[in-house]
Curated annotation (Swiss-Prot):
The modification Phosphoserine is found at S2, S24. This is Parvalbumin alpha. The modification N-acetylserine is found at S2. It holds the Pfam family EF-hand_7. Belongs to the parvalbumin family. It comes from the Eukaryota. GO terms for biological process: excitatory chemical synaptic transmission; gene expression; inhibitory chemical synaptic transmission. In muscle, parvalbumin is thought to be involved in relaxation after contraction. It binds two calcium ions. Ca(2+) 2 binds at D91, D93, D95, K97, E102. InterPro entries: EF-hand-dom_pair, EF_Hand_1_Ca_BS, EF_hand_dom, Parvalbumin. AB domain, comprising of helices A and B, is involved in structural stabilization, protecting the hydrophobic core of the protein. It is required for high-affinity binding of Ca(2+) and for Mg(2+)-binding. The keyword Phosphoprotein applies. It comes from Bos taurus (Bovine). Residues 39-74, 78-110 form the EF-hand domain.
Length: 110
């Protein structure tokens, strides 16, 4: 399954394009722009599993740095600051990674 099976390619392109500048990433705006906020909980979990590159059941800090690439392969990497901000927003239990339920909450709060 690919991201475009769940989200519109044009929405992905616009959302990724809106955050090309370093340190401009805002996960709340991004999730809204890409259309993820409007998706069912099941679809949000499918997106989570696409972003969980090592299939560990979590999106670790290293994977978060590549989150935009999960939506569009030619997108930029997040900066260290952006990655840490995203991790802090999503890691509700403080274990240093984001699980599927935490990701769903992060999207719902966007």
């Amino acid at each position: 399954m690919s991201m475009t099976d769940l989200l519109h390619a044009e929405d992905i392109k616009k959302a990724v394009g809106a955050f090309t500048a370093v340190d401009s990433f805002d996960h709340k705006k991004f999730f809204q722009m890409v259309g993820l906020k409007k998706k069912s909980p099941e679809d949000v979990k499918k997106v989570f599993h696409i972003l969980d590159k090592d299939k560990s059941g979590f999106i670790e800090e290293e994977e978060l740095g590549f989150i935009l690439k999960g939506f569009s392969p030619d997108a930029r990497d997040l900066s260290v600051k952006e990655t840490k901000t995203l991790l802090a927003a999503g890691d509700k239990d403080g274990d240093g990674k984001i699980g599927a339920d935490e990701f769903s909450t992060l999207v719902a709060e966007s």
